[in-house]
């Protein structure tokens, strides 16, 4: 009868609407990631940084995150240098090549005015037994308003 047809019609419409709403959302997410990756490949530092964040936070893939942070850093996105340096420092040990690379990344960002990078340079130097250098970088971070840097400088100067 006609009543059955109407019920099927309504069911079909609901299913169609559901598909129409959810499928493009999944595709849009995929294309946003692809778009970011393409922009990063073209040298867009912000896109590289966002990809680094995505891999660090969402995917929990530090190795891939580091690649994107390094690209962001090379393209002039200083927080990419800082975050990449942090991943390297966490992975490495004093005097390791990871520490050496972290130092380079922190140095670039610190010189550009990123106080967390200066603070982290203080910590790297401290871990490698370079107290005077550690104090210098903690002071630099402190002068930029980094309270942690002020506290560490004060403690080490005693």
Segments from the language model and where they lie:
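Bacterial N-terminal signal peptides
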Residues: 12-21
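Terminal, low-structured helical/coil segments at or just beyond the last alpha-helical repeat
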Residues: 140-158
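Short helix-capping/linker turns of helical repeat alpha-solenoids
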Residues: 41-45, 55-58, 75-78, 91-92, ...
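Residue-level detector of the short coil/turn that links helix A to helix B
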Residues: 59-60, 97, 129
């Amino acid at each position: 009868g006609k009543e059955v047809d109407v019920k099927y019609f309504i069911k079909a419409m609901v299913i169609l609407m559901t598909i129409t709403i959810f499928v493009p959302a999944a595709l849009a997410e995929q294309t946003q990631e692809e778009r970011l990756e393409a922009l990063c490949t073209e040298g867009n530092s912000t896109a590289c940084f966002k990809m680094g964040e995505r891999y660090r936070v969402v995917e929990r893939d530090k190795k891939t995150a580091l690649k994107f942070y390094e690209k962001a850093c090379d393209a002039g996105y200083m927080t990419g240098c800082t975050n990449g340096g942090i991943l390297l420092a966490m992975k490495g040990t004093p005097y390791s090549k990871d520490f050496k690379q972290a130092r380079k990344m922190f140095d670039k960002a610190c010189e550009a005015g990123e106080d967390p990078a200066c603070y982290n340079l203080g910590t790297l130097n401290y871990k490698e037994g370079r107290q005077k250098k550690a104090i210098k970088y903690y002071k630099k971070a402190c002068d930029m308003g980094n309270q942690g840097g002020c506290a560490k400088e004060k403690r080490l100067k005693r």
